[in-house]
Amino acid sequence: MSKVRVYEYAKEHQVSSKKVIEALKDLGIEVANHMSTINENALRQLDNAIDGTNKKAEAPKKETTSNENGNSKGPNKPNMTNSNEKSNKPNNPAGQANKPATANKSQGAKPATNKPANTSKQTQSSGNQQQAGGQKRNNNNNSNRPGGGNPNRPGGNNRPNRGGNFNNKGRNTKKKGKLNHSTVPPTPPKPKELPEKIVFSESLTVAELAKKLYREPSELIKKLFMLGVVATINQSLDKDAIELICDDYGVQVEEEIKVDVTDLDVYFENELNEAVDESKLVERPPVVTIMGHVDHGKTTLLDSLRNTKVTLGEAGGITQHIGAYQLEIHDKKITFLDTPGHAAFTAMRARGAQITDITILVVAADDGVMPQTIEAINHAKAAGMPIIVAVNKIDKPQANPDRVMQELTEYELVPEAWGGDTIFAPISAKFGEGLENLLDMILLVSEVEELKANPDRRAIGSVIEAELDKGRGPVATLLVQDGTLNIGDPIVVGNTFGRVRAMVNDLGRRVKKVGPSTPVEITGLNDVPQAGDRFVVFEDEKTARNIGETRASRALVAQRSATNRVSLDNLFEHMKAGEMKEVNVIIKADVQGSVEALAASLRKIDVEGVNVKIIHTAVGAINESDITLAAASNAIVIGFNVRPTAQAREAAENESVDIRLHRVIYKAIDEIEAAMKGMLDPEFQEKIIGQAQVRQTINVSKVGTIAGCYVTDGKITRDSGVRIIRDGIVVFEGEIATLKRFKDDAKEVAKGYECGITVQNFNDIKEDDVIEAYVMEEIERK
């Protein structure tokens, strides 16, 4: 007998090569892999080992088969197919005997006709038991012999052998076996116990609620329907529906309110709502805002209080920034905010009223109540702040304080002397009269208001002013409203963030920490914030950076969406805007407040047919990138209290960009308004330049009617328009076709001269008609 490879032996015995290798190793025969050869002696030992294993495995299989009506079920079907396929191989060794009788023994009295799979299986078992001599076995019993598969089957020798794979009864038997195995129904899983409490935020879908309650969504939909709520699996449920379902199951419900940590207003609301230990609160200085009409003496009043010349530093004597100063009077501090009185600073005054405690309304005794005075009253009332009226300029001869009091009663500001509750303090800011009384009134009102703050918490407050300093970078003037601000604190200011590097008070001195109601100038931010933004100090720099970057990205997205947003409501406005001319403007200023003021004023310019489009605003000097943007968008650059850099000036000359520099806001507004009026379509006015009387008419073929005229008034020009007037009625209006003096063409014919005139597209000229000549002159728009 020749040697056999491991994989060939495994294939003949229908076992894996791995199993054969393991069996050889158990016998002490080492083989390398499935391609190794097995000698005859090893084959005999391996046959005995494999036969012993098969006998042990066959015994329970036979027992199982006999318990199920003595039939071998469908799982043996692949073995039968393999046997039939092997029977067609020509390499079966001669002398190998087939054992059909073994199949009959294992099946008892039942004929083998109905069990082709069993025949193959039992034949293999018999063949394995009789291989003691080491000879190769033939696993096929019948396929090489006609009719040998089952001698008891009628016509068995005449029917072709299909190997059992296409036997319908075999298939049915297999199906029956499957049905018999699945007769025991699976035990349904027990539902999980209900939770004691569920937590949700805003709303839940039916599927999400079912998951939280460990129940099927269909069960919840049914319960909702019984409760009168029709819902689908993906439908969101409101709080009431969730509570109804959970109450039916006996589960508690808790709604979780998510707080947006990037919303700085939340920190201010929490300060108002949370209960504070009274022992930690200390008295804080009052924040006083000085309001009033332009040139009524607000800055002069503050100048007198501080004994400085603040007014001299303002261009044109007009306050154009918010100034914050702190004074110490009678061992008590008062913080003053000096807001501009010009109408352009309405937004700044409104912002000042929101962060103030007391409003001082300055009214000139010689001027009375003015428009900005009324506006300041409305701001203070809207903020709910107490008002102290300072009647200024009482030193002037034409001063009339009683008239001021009378006018203010119309706005519900009744003096205490007249039975009201408004404090009136007559003063002269220029000469310092009545200032002591005014300061006493401020301290009195602050005591009544009981202004307190907690200095032990992290600081929160508002931005009074912001600017870009060339040497220090972004600089912001902050008013600490609560808590204490220290150097090194991580801070978020509006949409900017950073760490406080340095702090300078209103006197220009460096400080390490500031308490409530104290103005301070800080550096260390990554960008210039907006005036009026709120600031919050956080625990660590990482949190501040994340919140600041998130707020900046949201602001950028909101800005982009706002500029491009179109709805059905404003669609027609957008369509109309396409027909309107625009003045593109870039505004650069020294501080953010001036940028806002100038932008607001330019937007209010009401010139028919022209819009002001502010495409960019920023704080700092005019740089080269501003010129590039202006050149691309055909814009005018307005610099307010700033100058262009050398590179920017050179770029502006190369790109022919118009740069306008101003130090007083009135001049900037007037200049832009004048430029806008120049951009309007020209306005024309008709001007009659002369009249001529028709004395004779001549009809000429191919030319028409020629009117022989005498100029009675003014002159007739070649390019003028004409009207044909007959009996005082205009019968035609058109243009002159030809104008001749004798036989020569003439540009104009003066009074007292005769001429020949033909009119375009009109030949019905008659004697005694009057030809009136006129021109359209462009006039300046007002």
UniProtKB/Swiss-Prot annotation:
Q: Which stretches does the entry tag as region G1?
A: 292-299
- One matching Pfam family is IF2_N
Q: Where is the segment annotated G3?
A: 338-341
SUPFAM superfamilies the UniProt entry points to: Initiation factor IF2/eIF5b, domain 3, P-loop containing nucleoside triphosphate hydrolases, Translation proteins
Cellular component, GO annotation: cytosol
Composition-biased stretches, type Basic and acidic residues, lie in 53-65
Residues reported to bind GTP: 292-299, 338-342, 392-395
Question: Which CDD domains does this UniProt record tie to the protein?
Answer: IF2_eIF5B, IF2_mtIF2_II, mtIF2_IVc
Q: Cellular location of this protein?
A: Cytoplasm
Region (Disordered) spans which residues? Answer: 47-196
- Domain tr-type G positions: 283-452
Region listing for G2, in residue ranges: 317-321
Recorded GO MF terms? GTP binding; GTPase activity; translation initiation factor activity
Q: Where does this protein have compositionally biased stretches of type Polar residues? A: 66-81
Region feature (G5): 428-430
Protein's UniProt keywords contain Transmembrane helix: no
- UniProt keyword annotations, A-Z: Cytoplasm, GTP-binding, Initiation factor, Nucleotide-binding, Protein biosynthesis
Role, per record: One of the essential components for the initiation of protein synthesis. Protects formylmethionyl-tRNA from spontaneous hydrolysis and promotes its binding to the 30S ribosomal subunits. Also involved in the hydrolysis of GTP during the formation of the 70S ribosomal complex.
Protein family membership = Belongs to the TRAFAC class translation factor GTPase superfamily. Classic translation factor GTPase family. IF-2 subfamily.
Name of the protein this chain belongs to: Translation initiation factor IF-2
